[in-house]
């Protein structure tokens, strides 16, 4: 999947909730590629948080995960302003890893 293309497509259609989901999946992929987490399809977000518990990434990943779960699993619509805030948070974190 071309995450950048799909994220931009979802955002341009106003589907910010899907864009947040895609950013989260891209983040997991990038973290696994950098050996920061051990990705497995059947692992939960809590599993990844536990892997990061004693690392410098934990606090930021916790916040990103909370925002993702709130919007995706809580089925809350994400406004454009909220999306920009969340996107910036993702980008800053990805620049650190």
Whereabouts are the PLM-identified features?
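Membrane-proximal, non-transmembrane interaction modules
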Residues: 4-97
């Amino acid at each position: 999947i071309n995450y950048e293309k799909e994220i931009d497509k979802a955002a341009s259609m106003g589907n910010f909730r899907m864009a947040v989901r895609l950013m989260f999946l891209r983040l997991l992929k990038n973290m696994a590629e950098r050996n920061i987490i051990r990705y497995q399809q059947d692992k939960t977000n809590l599993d990844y948080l536990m892997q990061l518990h004693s690392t410098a990434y934990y606090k930021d990943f916790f916040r990103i995960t909370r925002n993702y779960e709130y919007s995706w699993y809580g089925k809350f619509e994400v406004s454009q302003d909220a999306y920009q805030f969340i996107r910036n948070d993702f980008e800053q974190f990805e620049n650190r890893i």
